[in-house]
């Protein structure tokens, strides 16, 4: 299978994975362990090996009747684990390949994150319906409010996934520097009711990295308004196309919100690290 075809398949795991593998091809760091392109199935199992880590990627369009593929994955992965006992080893799988995901976890890989990449495909920009939110950027005297907003908005999601909570309060100085830099490039907007911060968004390049709404004011339409504001800002003021975002698999409410507002799923990933 040619590298171009492989990259098209890896893109279904995530666009970032595709970019990483593309660079690895340029540096001759890709081991094409198995590939198939038939009427019954299309897929690939590769390893990208560099000085820092080894990352496996597996994508198969048809996840049924793949016992032979599972054996190849099991045996080859074991070989690499023995070979690189001191190197970090990761395994990124297409989210619909449940049999492969189960096999990977049997081999000792622990899930880091599972989720989707979505892309805005609306033919027209969303309207900004009348709302009582006041739009601002970020200033240094807003730091405490931003910390409380982001940590409270992500608390339940992070807790449910076993991730560290209250990370912005813990890394206050780092978060502050990040916000100052984002504001300098007009990549962060905050939304207020009177003097209360109730929501915000952050974007980087063509990705919306954060959409947060204060838990006590959720389900009032603020999320849709802030999302629409972000899309319009990125498109009209920054001339950004292919607006995308990443959402955790467990965050079903957010995924539904995005899909109601013109986003479609373009990739589905399940990322693991060997322990």
Features from the language model and the residues they span:
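Conserved donor-binding loop and adjoining core beta-sheet/short helix segment
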Residues: 22-77, 197-209, 215
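Conserved acetyl-CoA pyrophosphate-binding loop and the N-cap/start of the following alpha-helix
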Residues: 65-76, 191, 217, 221-230
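Short amphipathic alpha-helix that is part of the acyltransferase structural core
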Residues: 1-23, 129-167
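Active-site rim helix/loop that mediates acceptor-substrate recognition in acyltransferases
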Residues: 11-38, 163-188
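Conserved active-site alpha-helix within GNAT-family acetyltransferase domains
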Residues: 95-113, 224, 249-267
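Acyl-donor-binding surface of acyltransferase catalytic domains
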Residues: 64-133, 137, 272
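A conserved beta-strand-loop-helix scaffold within acyl/acetyltransferase catalytic domains
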Residues: 47-52, 163-211
